[in-house]
Regions:
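Covalent nucleotidyltransferase
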Residues: 1-221
């Protein structure tokens, strides 16, 4: 990711950097669930946070433009522009965004370990950048383009997730199985209360499965 961006900046091309295609579900009130592209958006947010950490180290304070961009891209007040999956989100905010957690204790999942490792990697690599270089690469991120498709119905979103295949990481078999369960609940469950209860149960059970797999992978490593 960083190498690609650096190559783009050094190429001085007139075209914008391309982040790929994203699939969203419109949840209303200007909130969108990410159906496809979660991993890329997580990486982008981690990278921007690492840039701002380095900028603060160099300059001591942010310019008005930097403050505006940070509020637009990452966080303004107590409003977060991006959230990752529920079971990783608190760690994501504490370690990456707010920087109130500075150790690696209590990491429960492999995905949490990857979040911490990615942030630490970017912080380490960006130590070699001066303020001008940081702004150059931040500008490339801010002006990057992407294509998007947005759906309003969760059942359609789940169905599209199952069959979507683009530049992002291909869903695992477990993720597809979970999506199939959710899709069938939407398809065949007529009671809204029962539907909500079943969806919550499926998500909770799969969260437990993900954590169990993560612990097993950690023991193997």
């Amino acid at each position: 990711f960083l190498v690609d961006l650096q190559d783009y900046v050094e190429s001085h091309t007139a075209s914008s950097y391309y982040f790929g295609h994203f699939l969203f579900e419109d949840k209303g009130s200007r909130n969108f669930a990410i159906i496809d592209g979660q991993q890329r958006l997580t990486t982008i947010t981690i990278f921007i946070s690492a840039i701002y950490r380095r900028l603060e180290e160099l300059a001591g304070a942010f310019s008005e433009d930097d403050i505006f961009l940070y509020g637009t891209l990452v966080k303004v007040g107590q409003t977060y522009r991006f959230s990752t999956v529920d079971y990783d989100n608190q760690l994501f905010r504490d370690y990456v965004i707010n920087k109130v957690k500075t150790d690696r204790n209590g990491l429960e999942t492999e995905s949490q370990k990857r979040i911490v490792a990615a942030y630490d990697y970017f912080v380490s690599q960006l130590n070699a950048y001066d303020e001008e270089s940081l702004h150059d690469i931040l500008e490339a991120v801010v002006n990057a383009t992407c294509t998007t498709h947005t759906v309003k119905d969760e059942a359609e979103a789940i169905q599209m997730f199952i069959f979507q295949n683009n530049r992002g990481k291909k869903p695992s078999n477990l993720e597809i199985i979970k999506a199939q369960f959710l899709y069938n609940i939407h398809l065949y469950c007529t009671s809204e209360d029962e539907k909500a209860e079943l969806i919550s149960e499926v998500k909770n059970r799969f969260e437990h499965i993900y954590k169990s797999i993560s612990k097993i992978e950690g023991n193997i490593d």
